[in-house]
Regions:
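Conserved catalytic core of nucleotide polymerization and phosphodiester-bond processing enzymes
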Residues: 1-134
Length: 134
């Protein structure tokens, strides 16, 4: 994919100039080895330059969603509990009678947690346990 190659080249060039990369919410990863003479160290820093904005931004988004949902739970849904986070997934516990409404509210909240140039789509499922929800 040309766009992916362009992204990789542009982010490496920017990192070589700035000596850091940023996530969507401005967290920085400093890359002290990005211009290293040692090829292995330089290549490791280049890989980090490419991966950190993507993986770090995903982490930013899920953490922001957790904060938004925490406020929602405190203010509107005290009988719903956020149980755990697994990578980009959140697991909740709620009364069975409210499961559909809770699922839709969580999905909507997660999709609106950050404004991007493209839609942010969240998937949701209901189950009696984590395995059933997959």
């Amino acid at each position: 994919y040309t766009g992916v190659r362009d992204y990789m080249n542009n982010i490496k060039a920017q990192a070589k100039e700035d000596k850091f990369v940023e996530t969507i919410m401005g967290r920085r990863l400093y890359l002290n080895e990005i211009n290293a003479a040692n090829g292995l160290r330089r290549q490791a820093a280049e890989r980090a330059a490419i991966n950190a904005p993507l993986q770090g931004s995903a982490a930013d988004i899920i953490k922001k969603a957790m904060l938004d949902i925490d406020q929602l739970l405190l203010n509107e849904m005290q009988d719903v509990k956020m149980i755990m986070q697994v990578h980009d997934e959140l697991v909740f516990e709620c009364p069975k009678s409210k499961a559909d409404a809770v699922m839709e509210k969580m999905k909507d909240t997660m999709e609106k947690t950050v404004e991007l140039n493209i839609p942010l789509i969240a998937e949701a499922a209901i189950g009696s346990n984590w395995n059933e929800a997959h």
